From Swiss-Prot:
This is Sulfate adenylyltransferase subunit 2. It catalyses: sulfate + ATP + H(+) = adenosine 5'-phosphosulfate + diphosphate. GO terms for molecular function: ATP binding; sulfate adenylyltransferase (ATP) activity. One of its GO terms (biological process) is sulfate assimilation. The gene is cysD. It is an enzyme of class 2 (transferase). It comes from Serratia proteamaculans (strain 568). Pathway: Sulfur metabolism; hydrogen sulfide biosynthesis; sulfite from sulfate: step 1/3. Belongs to the PAPS reductase family. CysD subfamily. Pfam families: PAPS_reduct. The keyword Glycosyltransferase does not apply. Keywords: ATP-binding, Nucleotide-binding, Nucleotidyltransferase, Transferase.
Length: 302
């Protein structure tokens, strides 16, 4: 990795650590959202650096839908045990009682009840006034216009027309009771930055990001990995072994794999250098309707 690139990554690292420390100093009850993916892994690594040799001054929160890849649950529990941080896991009890199923109820309803409502329930339950998230501006157009400190009202709603100015590295965290701030320390990172930093810092990642033969079924132009026996095969669908990996991770029935031969971090980085598509092309929830992500964020989604 050349010196200019290394300097660029260290600048991003310093900015993110500064943001994490600012939030820890400014807010009374912050939390870090942990979705188990590559961005969460980088954000956790940066947080550990920010407070080394001490422990994290805030817990991690995983909003569980019950439909994550089995490898994600294993990686989550192993990471929590290895690093010894406080891990909170919340699953929407009403959604569980209703038997919400992405195959039966669709991606929009599943996401709204199990993720958006589940997140709001957890934030209310523990009274968090700031929540870190691993979203980046290069991921999607609504995230591109969102501030690093993203103000949310007492219903956890985001208003893109009512955002606070952020001049240089000055952030406005003033809130009233019941309001909160979503904080995005990785806002200025790109997908390539993330992978190069993972390689540079030797950060442990879930193997789903690396290509290997996996059982998949083709549906609506996406390759869905068959993770367990809850798969609802449609007429004419056949499960086959394909060499695939994931660029983004979510609920397995709603997350498409990409065909790839990249089995190592250098090969992923090489693939990123020539990629012309968004990593979120594999997220079914982004296809629900035009402006889908912005609508979800207005309702309280991350």
């Amino acid at each position: 990795m050349d010196e200019k690139r290394l300097t660029h990554l260290r600048q991003l690292e310093a900015e993110s650590i500064h943001i994490i420390r600012e939030v820890a100093a400014e807010f009374g009850n912050p939390v870090m959202l942990y979705s188990i993916g590559k961005d969460s892994s980088v954000m956790l690594h940066l947080a550990r650096k920010a407070f080394f040799p001490g422990t994290l001054p805030f817990p991690l929160l995983h909003v569980d839908t019950g439909w994550k890849f089995s490898e994600m649950y294993q990686f989550r529990d192993r990471t929590a045990k290895e690093y010894g941080f406080e891990l909170l896991v919340h699953k929407n009890p009403e959604g569980v009682a209703m038997g919400i199923n992405p195959f039966v109820h669709g991606s929009a309803k599943h996401t709204d009840i199990m993720k958006t409502e589940g997140l709001k329930q957890a934030l209310n339950k523990y009274g968090f006034d700031a929540a870190f998230g691993g979203a980046r501006r290069d991921e999607e157009k609504s995230r591109a216009k969102e501030r690093i400190y993203s103000f949310r009202d007492r219903f956890h709603r985001w208003d893109p027309k009512n955002q606070r100015p952020e001049l240089w590295h000055n952030y406005n965290g003033q809130i009233n009771k019941g309001e909160s701030i979503r904080v995005f320390p990785l806002s200025n990172w790109t997908e390539l930055d993330i992978w190069q930093y993972i390689f540079l810092e030797k950060i442990d990642i879930i193997p789903l990001y690396l290509a290997k033969p996996r059982p998949v079924v083709e549906r609506d132009g996406m390759l869905l990995m068959v993770d367990d026996d809850r798969i609802d095969l449609q007429p004419g669908e056949v499960i086959s072994q394909r060499m695939v990996r994931f660029r983004t991770l979510g609920c397995w029935p709603l997350t498409g794999a990409v065909e790839s031969e990249a089995q190592t971090l250098p090969e992923i980085i090489e693939e990123m250098l020539v990629s012309t598509t968004s990593e979120r092309q594999g997220r079914m929830i982004d296809r629900d309707q035009s402006g889908s992500m912005e609508l979800k964020k207005r309702q309280g989604y991350f």
